[in-house]
Regions:
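Conserved hydrolase catalytic core segment
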Residues: 93-136
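Catalytic histidine-centered segment of alpha/beta-hydrolase-like enzymes
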Residues: 260-269, 273
């Protein structure tokens, strides 16, 4: 595989940075990373995915993409339109969506809401948005409102890359190599050190989310084939019970559970890529 090629896409809400990681003449695959990650999330897997045209983006507020304007926040529904804008900017009427965590949740809802744009879903550690306990809705709403009324804090100064890598390792279980890939794309050099490029507003809690009944209705409406790769042990918000109940809502689903961390696609790229490649190959054989 050739070296990743950097480019940018202009969309309605801002400029989105992207990496082209495959063969531009191959099947079109749009890769969507997880919360506080970036396009580098898919670099380890890319050489194992075969001759696909893999484009991995930094979602707005992440990596090298622009931040949304002051006075706004990162609502889930707005990211859906960002993804459709990216497909338009690429000139792709349809594409296969590959998503990890938040990216997988977004891909799921795009497939439900704009089925004509999505050929298939390959999801890693996600099947719709995280579960939403409705009995805590008022408490979460108050926290979200209070959080937005607070004055913005000053950006944190990070003395060196090693310190940033340690911080990422403490925040989410993953290998050091995976953490370094994500960190290096999400740092900007400043006087006396580094700062995160990601928008601090990504840490704001959501005002509201979809109820579980809505998520399952979306899943049941997905027409395209779906591959789910889940890690064992499962994260708290994606336990086997709810994962399996959601999976049962799909019309055309395939699931594999493998030992690994939440970033299993970075820690075991060849193993996860083999499952995804086999899934895509099976689709090509369908008459």
């Amino acid at each position: 595989m050739s070296e990743p090629r950097e480019f940018v896409l202009d969309t309605a809400r801002g400029r989105i940075a992207a990496l082209r990681l495959g063969n531009p003449k191959g099947p079109k695959v749009l890769a969507l990373h997880g919360w506080l990650d970036n396009a580098a999330s898919f670099i380890p897997m890319a050489p194992h995915l075969g001759e696909v045209d893999l484009v991995a983006i930094d979602m707005l507020g992440h990596g090298a993409s622009t931040h949304i304007p002051a006075g706004y926040d990162y609502a889930f529904v707005d990211w859906l339109h960002d993804i459709l804008d990216v497909l338009d900017a690429l000139g792709w009427p349809q594409a296969h969506l590959l998503g990890h965590s938040l990216g997988g949740a977004l891909a799921t809802v795009v497939a439900a809401g704009a089925p004509e744009r999505v050929l298939s879903l390959a999801l890693i550690e996600a099947l719709g948005p995280p579960p939403w306990p409705g009995e805590h809705a008022a408490e979460r709403l108050r926290k979200a409102i209070a959080g937005r009324r607070k004055p913005a804090s000053l950006p944190r100064l990070i003395p060196d890359i090693a310190t940033a890598v340690r911080a990422r390792l403490q925040a989410t279980e993953k290998s050091e190599a995976a953490a370094r890939l994500l960190v290096e794309r999400n740092l900007k050099a400043v006087e006396d050190g580094y700062q995160w490029r990601s928008d601090p507003r990504l840490m704001w809690p959501s005002h509201m989310r979809a109820e579980e009944a809505s998520v399952r209705n979306w899943l049941a409406a997905i027409d395209c084939p779906v591959l789910l790769v889940a890690a064992d042990p499962a994260p708290v918000y994606f336990q086997p019970e709810i994962r399996n109940e959601r999976f049962a809502c799909l019309k055309h689903g395939e699931m594999h559970v493998i030992a690994g961390t939440h970033h299993v696609h970075m820690d075991k790229p060849a193993e996860v890529a083999a499952l995804i490649s086999a899934f895509w190959t099976s689709l090509a054989k369908v008459p």
